[in-house]
A protein has these predicted regions:
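Active-site metal-binding motif and surrounding structural segment of the metallo-beta-lactamase
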Residues: 86, 90-93, 115-165
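Metallo-beta-lactamase
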Residues: 2, 6, 11-12, 18-121, 125-129, 133, ...
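A short acidic, glycine-rich active-site loop
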Residues: 76-87, 128, 260-273
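Active-site environment of divalent metal-dependent phosphoester hydrolases
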Residues: 35, 58, 142-149, 173, ...
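Cap/insert and terminal regions of metallo-dependent hydrolase folds
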Residues: 2-3, 231, 235-315
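Active-site metal-binding loops of divalent metal-dependent hydrolases
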Residues: 52-53, 107-110, 142, 169-170, ...
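Short acidic loop-to-beta-strand element that houses the catalytic metal-binding Asp/Glu
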Residues: 93-95, 228-231
Length: 315
């Protein structure tokens, strides 16, 4: 059983998020999700950003950034061109055609988050992609907005022919969650979910070369026990998908040391972000974010005011 004491911030923050999605807390609800897709290239691979939905969180010192004044957070958001009173997080899995393989990185929220998410199937259809064609799914971590789309509304496998890659530590953690604990992480009917996907799951160790020359796991600790990013492709056109190591295209990049409420280990999460921003600026690494503004592909660059997110120009 998962020890709640190891993840106090994550339990509280995600519980608050789910309450707000259910309309328990005051404030305007995020708009209903719409299907959307954006093709781009990763070297010779064809990739597609797939919109699943989006989440909004208030600037209140507890829902996302903790330990900073609301005024300080608002000032950073405003300086970065974002709304000063709330955070906007997109949800966008990534699909990649690599030779005969069709790779899907995370699966969105499925039915877990109501009508603000769960549009991955529609986005795939609009992009001309078929769930049955997906050969491999790579899970960054086991929160509802990343694994909810693994199953359909009836509990069947949404991608019946896909091997599901997830880190050994993350799989162990997910498999050990009680129903009540799982709800705090945005997961409903966790036992049924685990049972459905178990025959397809292939756990891996941190840093594993999963598909040689195509996908390599990159450990990015702090958010969940076995949180993993993925390097896709090789050479200068490769892309690093970093999961939930960063959430906000403004705050996570400009203030990576600021701690996040729903990181299981908030200090490790901050350390990971600091290193990720620093290495990305130095290397010019292309990045894919599942929560930055759609379509989530770009780089982190250094300017006179510090680091900032530079979306890739796609035509």
């Amino acid at each position: 059983m998962t020890d709640r004491r190891r993840f106090p911030g994550a339990f509280a923050a995600i519980s608050a998020l789910l309450m707000s999605l259910a309309g328990v807390t005051a404030g305007a609800a995020p708009p209903a999700a719409v299907a959307q897709f954006q093709p781009f290239k990763i070297g010779s691979y064809s990739a597609v950003a797939l919109k699943d939905g989006g989440i909004e969180e208030p600037v209140d010192g507890k829902s996302f950034i903790v330990g900073q004044s609301n005024e300080e957070v608002a000032a950073v958001l405003k300086a970065g061109g974002a709304p000063a009173d709330h955070f906007e997080f997109s949800i966008q899995p990534l699909l990649v055609h690599a030779g005969v393989r069709v790779l899907l990185f995370d699966t969105g929220a499925g039915g877990f988050f109501g009508d603000i998410a769960g549009k991955l199937p529609e986005s795939m259809k609009e992009a001309g992609e078929k769930p049955a064609s997906v050969t491999d799914i790579f899970i960054s971590h086991a929160h509802g907005d990343h694994i909810g789309g693994l199953v359909t509304s009836t509990g069947a496998l949404a991608f019946p022919n896909a091997t599901i890659h997830i880190s050994t530590q993350e799989w162990k953690w997910l498999s050990g969650l009680s129903e009540d604990e799982a709800k705090n992480f945005g997961i409903h009917q966790v036992s049924a979910l685990v049972s459905a996907i178990k025959p397809k799951v292939v756990p891996f160790e941190p840093g594993a070369d999963l598909l040689k020359g195509i996908v390599k796991a990159v450990p990015l600790g702090g958010h969940t026990p076995g949180h993993s990013g993925y390097r896709i492709g090789s050479g200068p056109d490769s892309v690093l998908l970093f999961g939930d190591a960063m959430h906000s295209y403004v705050v996570s990049v400009r203030k990576p040391s600021w701690q996040v409420a729903f990181d299981g280990d908030q200090q490790l999460g901050a350390t990971t972000r600091i290193a990720l921003v620093k290495s990305s600026v130095a290397s010019g690494q292309r990045l894919y974010s599942e929560h930055f503004p759609f379509p989530g592909i770009g780089k982190i660059v250094k300017g006179k005011d510090g680091a900032s997110w530079q979306p890739e120009s796609l035509h």
